[in-house]
Structure formats: C-alpha cells, structure tokens
Amino acid sequence: MQIKDILAEIERFAPLPYQESYDNCGVQVGDAGIEATGALLTLDVTEAVLDEAIARGCNLVVAHHPLIFSGLKSITGRNYVERTILKAIRHDIVIYAAHTNLDNVQAGVNRKIAERLGLQQARILAPVKESLYKLYTYVPESQATALLAALFTAGAGSIGEYSECSFATPGAGTFRPSAHSKPVIGAAGGPREIVAEQKLEVIVPKHLKAAVLKTLKENHPYEEVAYELIALENENQTIGAGMVGRLENPMAPEDFLRFLKEKMKTACVRYTAPPAGKIRTVALCGGAGSFLLKQARAAGADVFVTGDYKYHQFFDAEDQIMIADIGHYESEQFTIEIFSEIVKEKFPNFALLFTKTNTNPVNYYF
C-alpha cells in the first residue's frame, strides 16, 4: 500500500478545498507514491516527532498543524522548520497536514470536542455559503436510474446526514437530429423526435463539480447532454466553523468549568464572568476561535469554549456569555483520534501510532 492511498482516505473525509485561503494543507514534504511502513499521528510536527517516527519505523507523519505555513526562500537548517524538513528528506519521510479542512467538516475537530462534552443536537456554528450547486439534467426514462447511480457514486446528492437525494419530474423531450449527428434515438437528418424523459435534480458540492460533470457526460446516453448547473446561496450545514449544542443536564458555571477541565484534560481554564443561571447551550471552536464569538452569542450559547483568547478580547463577552479558554493545544489534542478512525475504517491492519511526544510549547506553573 502506498502512502497516497492513506492520504486519499483523509482527503475524502476532509477535502483539501475546504481549507481556509491562508492555510497550507496536504503533502508538505516527501513522495506520497512510496510504500507505507507506518504512520505517526500528531498535532504538530517537530524534530522530536521526526526522531520518534524514525525510531518507530514510520515513514509517514500525519499532523493537524502544517509544518510549512508560508513560503520558504531557503532550507539551510537555521530554524526548527527547516531542520525538520531536512531530516524528513534525509530519512525519506512524508509529512502531511490536515488543518482547517479538518476543522471545517461536520465530523471533524469540533465534533470531537462536542462528543467529549456530551453535547446533544450538535450542529455547525457558522455554516459556509455558496458551496453548493443544483444540477438539472434530462434523460430517457429507461436510463434515469443508471444515470442517477453514477452521479451518486461521483458524490452528488448528499444533504446533511442523507445521501442519494434527488428529485425527478416526468416530461417529454424533443429534438431533431442534424445530418451530421449520431443520435441514440432517431436517425441523422431524420424528423423531430419526442421522447419520454425525466428531469433529474441533484445537489453537487462545489469541490466535486468537475468530477460530477465528467460523470454526467460519460454516463448520459445522449451525444449532446442537456444540463443546467446553478450556484445556490443556501448554507451548507455540513461545512463550516465551530459547533454548538446542548448539555444533557444543565450545570452551574463552576460545575461546568470543573467538568470542562476534566473532559478536555487541561491544566487550567481562563474564563470570563458567567451570565446568570445554568450552563445549557455550549458553543465551541478548536484552536483559535475568537472570530466566532458573535455567532456563539447569536446561537444563544451560555458559554463559548475555545483557545488563544487575547486579554482585550475577553471584554467582548460583555457579561452576555462566558468565554472559556482551555488553550490551543488542549482544544485540539484529540484530533489524532480522528485520523486514526478515518484510516482504520479502510485499512484496519495498517500500523497507526499515536505520538508519545508532547508538542505543546506552552507550560503551566501553579
């Protein structure tokens, strides 16, 4: 099995087009075409992590945070990024990162936090817009089922927790073949044909547009395929930032903070004064999530759990919501479990190892 086979499963789960514009996800170093010996799963890539991969026989390191964020003008070993790259090249190790693309999928980083907190009815806090298309096409009734099956296989027809979604309308299609045509129905240069057809409608994710159209043209019986592809303004409830849900049992603020500290295995929690009453609705965002405070308040959250809050940003709570900063590393430390779950589903016998190296650069003194 080649490394690219493993990475294909990760990208099927968290497509690269879902990453933010500033991000740098995907293969960072190495040749993904080589045979895989084992994968080391980590939040960050450091020299120590590379040493561990070498010692444990892994030639693939899968990380949440990219090692390379911005362009490099030279690789001389003058900092830890360059030294890590050089070490990976010397030992033929592939470094791969799934960052904001994994943040932005429904079953990604934020779902993992929501699961640890036992949130009910968890949903994406800030769904993205303009990431969906509606595809309409017209096909003879006898071949509608086969065409739909091909479109579904290509990724069309998914709406939230439902797949193979479509709508069909019966009708009559007309056409007159030219003398140079090669019609499936009728004859070149013949009279106008009237065919019993179905108008098929399916949703297409933006990142699968090209693949779905290719499938349509390859599987449609007509020489000239009639179709319309229309961009939608609908929110895509399966892609976006953050998550919000409800606790099964509301808690007093102090009890919730104790619960949060235990479940997220964090040394401390920085927080603002809680609003009156119990904590019922919890908004959250793994990593640095201060940009989602407005959405958390709009969702009626009693608390917003995230990391990397700056001093002056805490004032933005305005006593309307409790901000609970558990730390960047702490909020995302369980992300490696997601990588393991993705790969094990397809390759249950492949060697997947969790790093033993603590890559958190922040220490706490009490």
For each feature predicted by the language model, list its residue ranges.
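Hydrophobic structural segments
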Residues: M1-F366
